[in-house]
């Protein structure tokens, strides 16, 4: 819930401008935004089936960057901030494990192009500028396949 709550707050304050979400978030009180976040966090995550072709080499490349970074490109390991299991560090560092790959690529691309600036100290913007589209896809496809205990509900 904390990540969605932060995003709604960022939409409401215009730190994350969006033609659709900004007016919606601005129409909600802080308590309403927290309630919406809690509601969505309580929903069981759907079964996720991987679509499309992704090579084992791409997933291995993503895992390597996630765990060790890419010193030659000046990329730190994702695990340095997002944790060894990719579950993040609330409230400022979101989880990556189990996240939709296309969503992650989109966010990284927006940081790279300077469209997002709501990350702490501009850290993700600086990192994304050093990434190739292939790096973004590899990391995103890797984390898509990492189980996240925070979002995986017990079916019982």
Task: Please name every model-derived segment.
Residues 1-18, 22-28, 79, 83-113, ...:
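Gly/Gly-Pro-rich "capping" loops immediately C-terminal to redox-active cysteine motifs
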Residues 1-3, 11-21, 28-35, 44-52, ...:
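Short sequence/structural segments immediately N-terminal
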Residues 26-49, 102, 126-155:
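C-terminal capping alpha-helices of c-type cytochrome domains
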Residues 30-32, 56, 66-71, 79, ...:
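C-type cytochrome heme-c attachment and multiheme electron-transfer modules
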Residues 36, 75-85, 139:
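The canonical Cys-X-X-Cys-His
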Residues 42-71, 89, 148, 152-156:
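Electrostatic cytochrome c docking/interface patches
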């Amino acid at each position: 819930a904390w990540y969605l709550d932060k995003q709604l707050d960022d939409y409401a304050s215009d730190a994350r401008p969006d033609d659709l979400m900004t007016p919606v978030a601005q129409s909600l009180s802080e308590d309403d935004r927290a309630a919406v976040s809690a509601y969505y966090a309580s929903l069981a995550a759907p079964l996720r089936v991987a679509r499309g072709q992704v090579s084992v080499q791409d997933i291995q490349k993503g895992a390597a960057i996630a765990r060790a970074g890419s010193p030659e490109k000046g990329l730190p390991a994702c695990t340095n901030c997002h944790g060894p299991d990719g579950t993040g560090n609330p409230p400022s560092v979101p989880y990556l494990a189990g996240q939709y790959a296309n969503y992650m690529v989109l966010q990284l691309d927006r940081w790279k192009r300077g469209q997002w600036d709501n990350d702490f100290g501009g850290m993700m913007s600086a990192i994304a500028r050093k990434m190739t589209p292939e790096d973004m896809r590899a990391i995103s496809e890797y984390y898509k396949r990492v189980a996240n205990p925070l979002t995986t509900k017990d079916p019982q």
